[in-house]
Amino acid sequence: MSRAVGIDLGTTNSVVSVLEGGEPTVIANAEGGRTTPSVVAFSKSGEVLVGEIAKRQAVNNIDRTIASVKRHMGTDWNVAIDDKKYTAQEISARILMKLKNDAESYLGEKVTDAVVTVPAYFNDAQRQATKEAGEIAGLNVLRIVNEPTAAALAYGLDKGKEDELILVFDLGGGTFDVSLLEVGKDEDNFSTIQVRSTAGDNHLGGDDWDQRVVNYLLNQLKVKGIDLSKDKIALQRLREAAEQAKKELSSSTSTNVSLQYLSVTPDGPVHLDEQLTRAKFQDLTKDLLDRTKKPFQDVIKEAGIKLSEIDHIVLVGGSTRMPAVYELVKELAGGKEPNKGVNPDEVVAVGAALQAGVLKGERKDVLLIDVTPLSLGIETKGGVMTHLIERNTAIPTKRSETFTTADDNQPSVAIQVFQGEREFTRDNKPLGTFELTGIAPAPRGVPQVEVTFDIDANGIVHVSAKDKGTGKEQSMTITGGTALSKEDIDRMVKDAEEHAAEDKARREATDTRNTAEQLAYSVDKLIADNADKLPEEVKTEVKADVDALKKALEGTDDAAVKTAFEKLQASQSKLGEAIYAQAGSPDGATGPAGAESAAGSEGAKADEDIVDAEIVDEDEKK
């Protein structure tokens, strides 16, 4: 049986690990390093360079060197080299191929199976892109695992038998996650690791700290009348110097940034010699650090625990070596010291190797239960986001809900899938759309369309829709799409909290419109079906209220809709009274129940389990 490796595919650095005798070992690359820079370059001779060698030549080959490609995963980003366009998946695949080759050299055998990690807050498109990159690299991706979960797996296996809570604070080169996990062992030493909650920011990491230093140095030069903001070579040298300064300031209180012959101007060569203190560095990046606070607090709140209940805090990612990060985590945790016995650069890959061992049967003493980071649902009438799976639900998971049509004889429904926390789909992330056709002609509200969401262990979404009447089914695996822009996912949760009242009012107005439309339709039908039994004056009065409601529904005044709706609700009872009186006795009539609230007369026979929401035919919307 071939060996499986664990890969931490990072924004700035990547690591590969393997189980040897059941224990994880980090594999050194061909250059002797335990971490490989996530940098790919195309030399002018056509050679593809990856890792340290690509990073070293970046200054002299800027336009043909790609770094931090992880930030583009799941988007339509591409880079043109020698008239050929490369996607983010293809560039990432080059990094994975390098790690694969290094592992094969170390093990002396072919490597095809791998567990690859992603940030916990990666959306569906980003996870799919990561899996595709693995496939391009010739890897069979056994599982996509969240980075904080992998870290907890590596850290938590040697813990005691008591259930313990581990908080993982993962600040990498380009992404940030916080996760709370529960780790426990039974009497047989079988470990269960379950994610309780997770939060994060897909566009926050060490690269942003570096950029602040670059901006500061550029401004210092501007004061002297020198603008290098368009000088690509100078910018690359500044980026490298900024990264080095950041690292040095983790162990010393000041550093000197000295770059001779940084550029050449008409006045001569430009030299940079700037002193940067840790205090100044922390001042330049304070707002970046502040952005880590809310996800931390959200995780604690969603898990419903007290800070004192956290047993261990694990720092992951090279960026957590910054003293300000360590102190902030300690402060947020109520004074509890984060664990210093974990290598933040390697722990994720070690956890990935352990999970690979579990999947290959090398380790049989671990069960890993992860969660989906964002709620999933479909658009129903009025643009409402109807959730089928809530955020922080354990995966894999499956959930079905039955919906109905919005129009008479509607031949098809468009199933529009969204991810996010807001009440309306326009405020959430669209994942994809597919159409269920061939619905048998029937009055609206009669067809039953069962929509099923299935999230696999990789966190990848599969959606299907089935017409219960005809048995016709349509399904899709969510792929492609555009990834979330900076802070998008975090914004979804934040916006949901900030706009809760506004969303509630809009939701109520939409619900009123939907109910009002159903009432007008039902009362109209009741009048038509009983035209010969109703006195003219009753018909005229109620019909006028129906027409008034229909007119209000054509407008945008929600208050007018509510008023007209309430008026029709009151007057429609006269229809039942008139029909009852016409029948002359209870034996000859359907009774008051036969003319109950018209809003219920048409739909009451429907299955009680059917959700009171309608899927709109896209053609009607156009």
Swiss-Prot record:
Name of the protein: Chaperone protein DnaK
PROSITE patterns to which the protein is assigned, alphabetical: HSP70_1, HSP70_2, HSP70_3
Region (Disordered): 496-515, 579-622
NCBIfam families assigned to the protein according to its UniProt record, in alphabetical order: PRK00290.1, prok_dnaK
Keywords: ATP-binding, Chaperone, Nucleotide-binding, Phosphoprotein, Stress response
Top-level taxon of the source organism: Bacteria
Gene that encodes it: dnaK
Residue positions, PTM Phosphothreonine: 175
Alphabetized GO MF terms: ATP binding; ATP-dependent protein folding chaperone; unfolded protein binding
Gene3D superfamilies linked to this entry: 1.20.1270.10, 3.30.420.40, Actin, Chain A, domain 4 (3.90.640.10), Substrate Binding Domain Of DNAk, Chain A, domain 1 (2.60.34.10)
Biased composition (Basic and acidic residues): 496-511
